[in-house]
């Protein structure tokens, strides 16, 4: 008997050793399941690599690790991501964005009417659902699911090109507030793109996984997700490897686009006060918007950033009206004492036959100015934070980890506002732009049976949970 046990033990050790050597020296298998973050403003795709335990967020053909959640329809084709972004100002009525706000959601006619005024494209109400009307060779009606499917198809193609093999299975994230119909509509969009969804995971849970919180001893986790257009705050209660969403709040009309708009309005006023005209050419407005976005990004790292945009002045715009200052609102557009904006208007080429000339508008924007223009918006971030603490019956001192998600949480002043409120630094160990897609990719690796095996995050459904929105 003892001899048999010895032989059995030796066999087990041999198998374990063989498995270890196989992991060390055999070629690593290619990931078979992708993880997708289908965001409101940007979306991305990632994979978990067996053996190394690393996550790779897959870039597009130009090296972008996320693509704008935009789809444009023209007479000849459908453009997705950055190609769509380039058409946004020249073809606004046929460029659909924010489709995630509409997917699977039931609207009353009054609710939808309140939403559609924000968009240049046409939104229709059909049996309680939203649809989009676009005109290419003819007028066609497209659903939010179809728009989502075009984005998911682009992400699928990016993954297939990177991995060098077809991809059929995915894990996808959705907001914790999504009901069953919204989740099923998201799955339907993936099916249209040729993807089978193995699991739907809540975005806050995915972010917590990216930070490794499913493997450490924490109890209460607050996830602050501030992206391009929405703010979502979620209170997670972690019990072992399980996550329960205790409370949700947010503002679905607050994000990086709003911060950009404040700076854009300010620059418009600077141009108007000097020249008495506002940029009206679509390509110049597009360049100005791009410049504002670049300034915002640069100000996360530097104390000042430069704006330089070439503008066209029509002959009848060359004289500044005497009452120019009264044409634009003053609130939030004028910096306080101590702000200096270095404006340079350089005359360019003039065409006497067409009555047009060009000027180079240059200005230096300080981080202090940017913060002043947006301070009231930054403070609004605290409102849903206070609400989830109230609904969760917790004091802010009881929160174990404050996790930041979304590109707008890079803004130094926003991090400072959060730090001052909680009295401690938020967890910034993960790239906030990639937190959700990283967590989804980890879960995709788990569902695909990748090794080294990670601890899976189990979500406890909370059917009574309602999100409080502050708009």
Swiss-Prot record:
Partners and quaternary state? Binds UBQLN2.
Could you confirm whether the keyword Ion transport appears in this record?
A: no
Q: What does this protein do?
A: Has peptide-independent ATPase activity.
The record's listing under Pfam families reads: HSP70
Protein's UniProt keywords contain Cell membrane: no
Q: Which family does it belong to?
A: Belongs to the heat shock protein 70 family.
Q: What is the official name of this protein in its record?
A: Heat shock 70 kDa protein 13
Could you tell me which cysteines form disulfide bridges? Answer: none
From the UniProt record, give one GO term of the biological process aspect.
protein refolding
- Species: Rattus norvegicus
Give the GO molecular function terms: ATP binding; ATP hydrolysis activity; ATP-dependent protein folding chaperone; heat shock protein binding; protein folding chaperone
Q: Where are glycans found on this sequence?
A: 184
* Top-level taxonomy: Eukaryota, Metazoa, Chordata, Craniata, Vertebrata
Keywords, ordered alphabetically: ATP-binding, Endoplasmic reticulum, Glycoprotein, Microsome, Nucleotide-binding, Signal
The signal peptide annotation in the UniProt record is 1-22
